[in-house]
Amino acid sequence: MNMKNVAQLVQETKVVAIVRGLDSGYEQLAQALYGGGIRAIEVTFNQKDPSTWVQTTGAIHAIRETMGEKMAVGAGTVTTVELVQLAFDAGAEFIVSPDTNEAVIRRTKKLGMVSMPGAMTPTEIRQAYAAGADFVKVFPAGTLGSGYIKAIRGPLNNIPLLAVGGV
């Protein structure tokens, strides 16, 4: 799926399933999610244990092989340019980060992937979008509440937002 199609898919479906901490069964999970109407899946990197990164990239690759163009597959908890490259090499189509790291956003865009960095404040949201983000992940949205998201959308209605974290 090209970058435009991935962005359009996320915009239309408004849901990205987040998968964290599985040892196996990614292909079956992706098929079940697809059967339930989910069209985008994010497989997260474990920052505490880099030895699991091979498993994460393997899962991204396996889901891409299994689902083909039916489902957009991305990497989450991407905090470095190195992880952007690992995700891209595995076949990721989008990158999700917990923060706004401009180097990560630039590398993501250079590689032709959709960028979804995390931000919380209006200033961070604007900075992420100005740096090239396709969507800005408002995180932790569950802690902030739906009223916060509604309030942010008023003055920042030109920036595509994703509410993530305890939603």
Regions found by a protein language model. Name each.
Residues I60, I105, I149-K150:
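Short amphipathic alpha-helical segments and helix-helix/interface helices
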Residues E93:
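Short, glycine/charged-rich "phosphate-handling" switch motifs in NTP-dependent
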Residues F45-K48, V78, D99-E102, M120-T121, ...:
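Short, ordered loop/turn segments at secondary-structure junctions
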Residues Q28-L29, T80-A90, T123-A133, Y148, ...:
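Catalytic cores of alpha/beta
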Residues R107-V114:
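C-terminal helical cap(s) of enzyme catalytic domains, especially alpha/beta-barrels
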Residues M1-A90, T100, K110, N158:
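Conserved N-terminal beta1-alpha1 strand-loop-helix module at the mouth
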Residues F135-V167:
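Active-site/ligand-binding-proximal alpha/beta "capping" segment
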Residues A40-E42, G74, V96, M116, ...:
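Conserved beta-strand positions in the central sheet of alpha/beta enzyme cores
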